[in-house]
From Swiss-Prot:
Its EC number is 7.1.1.2. This is NADH-ubiquinone oxidoreductase chain 4L. It catalyses: a ubiquinone + NADH + 5 H(+)(in) = a ubiquinol + NAD(+) + 4 H(+)(out). Keywords: Electron transport, Membrane, Mitochondrion, NAD, Respiratory chain, Translocase, Transmembrane, Transmembrane helix, Transport, Ubiquinone. It comes from the Eukaryota. The chain crosses the membrane at residues 1-21, 29-49, 56-76.
Length: 76
């Protein structure tokens, strides 16, 4: 596992652990969800760049759109 993959995997796991342990406060739970979505977005973007597949380049943008919808629904 390269250091880049390790850092994004650990960022996702830290966000997941923060979500599991900070369920009492809504804002901290939403921030943990945003951290998880951001690490997934960067990981999917890097994966599409490494594979040099243009068909997979749409997936990070869809994930970013769903993440924005999740954040706006949570803060409403």
């Amino acid at each position: 596992m390269t250091p880049v993959h390790f850092s994004f995997t650990s960022a996702f796991i830290l966000g997941l652990m923060g979500l599991a342990f900070h369920r009492t406060h809504l804002l901290s739970a939403l921030l943990c969800l945003e951290g998880m979505m951001l690490s997934l977005f960067i990981a999917l973007s890097l994966w599409a760049l490494q594979m040099e597949a243009t068909g997979y380049s749409v997936a990070p943008m869809l994930l970013l759109a769903f993440s924005a919808c999740e954040a706006s629904a949570g803060l409403a």
